[in-house]
């Protein structure tokens, strides 16, 4: 896995762990790993970006989404399903690269969402380029 050093504008405390999982995993594995990373961010200050894939078509439901919704049941009845820690609606995962990121709740970047997402997306683009992808 390529290593990425902090940019000049970042301090050493802003180092972010980049995790790229080669093997596709089950939805329950992916959500459990995301939960573990979130707990590590909250309790130990971890900053991480994780890139991963799904081993089978899986629908992930948002944290507050009603899993008994009849439209969801009909549409996704034959698929594996998991619940995300984040909100939002149902997402069908298959043949994709998914990412998650965690930072401590008291990190100043939590108050600057545009800059936070910009940094995360730049890090992902840098990693993809390291692997030969043509992206911007």
Regions found by a protein language model. Give the residues of each.
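Short, surface-exposed, polar/charged, turn-prone segments marking secondary-structure boundaries
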Residues: 48, 78-80, 89-90, 112-113, ...
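Catalytic-loop motifs flanking and including active-site residues across diverse enzymes
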Residues: 33, 95, 120
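Generic secretory/membrane-interface signal
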Residues: 1-2, 78
């Amino acid at each position: 896995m390529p290593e990425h050093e902090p940019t000049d504008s970042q301090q050493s405390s802003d180092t972010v762990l980049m995790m790229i999982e080669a093997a596709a995993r089950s939805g329950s594995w992916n959500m459990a790993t995301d939960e573990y990373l979130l707990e590590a961010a909250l309790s130990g200050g971890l900053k991480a970006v994780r890139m991963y894939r799904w081993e089978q078509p899986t629908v992930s439901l948002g944290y507050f989404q009603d899993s008994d919704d009849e439209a969801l049941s009909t549409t996704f009845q034959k698929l594996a399903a998991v619940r995300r820690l984040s909100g939002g609606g149902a997402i069908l995962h298959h043949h994709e690269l998914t990412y998650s990121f965690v930072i401590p709740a008291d990190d100043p970047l939590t108050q600057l969402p545009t800059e936070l997402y910009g940094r995360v997306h730049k890090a992902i683009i840098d990693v993809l380029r390291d692997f030969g992808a043509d992206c911007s």
